[in-house]
């Protein structure tokens, strides 16, 4: 069993195990229990009453956080048709098949996210096994396969985050950094929970959201009222 650090034990002692906290108190506790020396990420985890084995209950998408993520994303746009629009939108890197070959042949990953126009997808499919495990494969559901590359790049730069339910029905999303003002974290949390409610599958019966947990990088989980 992994050894629990003294710092984590101290953080854990501040959180009542089975208590469900109001959002403002949960955010305050998350800041107090951040155990890292760097500016920790604040994450929210939704445990949903879904069965991801069913096609109509596989949840995936993206949401723009109104207060941003606190992280700068390097955006690669792959296109043969929207180069000018991508450059004007201030994409970090813009190119076509030559960049796909660079990823394939040079193991090049100087970017955080890929936006592609539809005509590039057949070529991208050839390196799907490289991009997929890294979570870098563009997907229409997350808005990263699109002809409107300007909007896609703008949304990412503003603070768009992607989400996907795992096989246990959990969705993990970042809502900012510990250094954010509580109001900004609250704003992002509300945007995220609104999005999760919006994508509720019609076939779900009973309670949709089972519980919500807030945490920081390497910090304890804090149950949140909803």
Swiss-Prot record:
The keyword Repressor applies. One of its GO terms (cellular component) is large ribosomal subunit. One of its GO terms (biological process) is translation. One of its GO terms (molecular function) is tRNA binding. InterPro entries: Ribosom_uL1_bac-type, Ribosomal_uL1, Ribosomal_uL1-like, Ribosomal_uL1/biogenesis, Ribosomal_uL1_3-a/b-sand, Ribosomal_uL1_CS. Keywords: Repressor, Ribonucleoprotein, Ribosomal protein, RNA-binding, rRNA-binding, Translation regulation, tRNA-binding. Disulfide bonds: none annotated. Pfam families: Ribosomal_L1 (PF00687). Part of the 50S ribosomal subunit. Binds directly to 23S rRNA. The L1 stalk is quite mobile in the ribosome, and is involved in E site tRNA release. Belongs to the universal ribosomal protein uL1 family. This is Large ribosomal subunit protein uL1. It comes from Mycoplasma capricolum subsp. capricolum (strain California kid / ATCC 27343 / NCTC 10154).
């Amino acid at each position: 069993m992994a050894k629990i650090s003294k710092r984590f034990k101290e953080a854990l002692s501040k959180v009542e195990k089975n208590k469900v906290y109001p959002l403002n108190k949960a955010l305050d506790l998350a800041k107090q229990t951040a155990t890292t020396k760097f500016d920790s990420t604040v994450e929210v985890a939704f445990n949903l009453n879904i069965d991801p084995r069913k096609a109509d209950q596989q949840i995936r998408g993206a949401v723009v956080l109104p207060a941003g993520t606190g992280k700068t994303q390097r955006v690669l746009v792959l296109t043969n048709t929207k180069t000018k629009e991508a450059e004007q939108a201030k994409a970090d890197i813009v190119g076509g098949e030559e960049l796909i070959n660079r990823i394939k042949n040079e193991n090049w990953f100087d970017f955080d996210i890929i936006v592609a126009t539809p005509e590039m997808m057949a070529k991208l499919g050839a390196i799907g096994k490289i991009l997929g495990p890294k979570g870098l494969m563009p997907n229409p559901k997350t808005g990263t396969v699109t002809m409107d590359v300007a909007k896609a790049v703008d949304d990412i730069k503003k603070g768009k985050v992607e989400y996907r339910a795992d096989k246990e029905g959990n969705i993990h999303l970042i809502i900012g950094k510990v250094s954010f003002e509580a109001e900004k974290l609250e704003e992002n949390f509300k945007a995220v929970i609104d999005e999760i409610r919006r994508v509720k599958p019609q076939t779900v019966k009973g309670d949709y959201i089972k519980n919500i947990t807030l945490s920081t990088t390497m910090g304890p989980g804090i149950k949140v009222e909803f």
